[in-house]
């Protein structure tokens, strides 16, 4: 399947791609350009940035509230929006899909993935690490 990479930011991060015979997909980057914080399927990057301008700062530093997450999705009803929150240098801590349902990721003292929980705080998956001497 062919994909056209339409645009990049000044740090070389992909900001928009279009699958063959498909709709554009915008990627918004945060945490000083280190991590993708939103994938918006169905509109261009320029339109996404324009429509989300009031939320970009909070989205880019991971401080968007649950209420703001919902409002963000209502701004662009024609698009499917997935958002990501990170603990820098560790990993993703929350992924919220287009349906508004979140998965939360927790890490142990050594920054290894420990659990994945749903938005009702129910454990979906646990990880154990065993080392052999």
Name each model-derived stretch.
Residues 1-19, 23-97, 102-133:
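Beta-strand elements of repeat-based all-beta scaffolds
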């Amino acid at each position: 399947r062919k994909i056209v990479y339409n645009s990049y930011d000044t740090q070389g991060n992909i900001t928009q791609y279009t699958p063959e015979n498909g709709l554009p997909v915008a990627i918004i980057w945060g945490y000083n350009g280190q991590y993708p914080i939103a994938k918006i399927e169905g509109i261009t990057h320029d339109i996404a940035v324009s429509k989300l301008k009031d939320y970009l700062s909070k989205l880019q530093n991971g401080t968007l509230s649950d209420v703001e997450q919902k409002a963000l999705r209502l701004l662009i009803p024609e698009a499917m929006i997935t958002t990501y929150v990170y603990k820098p240098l560790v990993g993703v801590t929350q992924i919220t899909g287009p349906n508004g349902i979140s998965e939360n990721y927790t890490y142990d003292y050594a920054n290894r993935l420990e659990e994945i929980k749903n938005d009702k705080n129910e454990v979906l998956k646990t990880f154990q690490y065993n080392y052999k001497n």
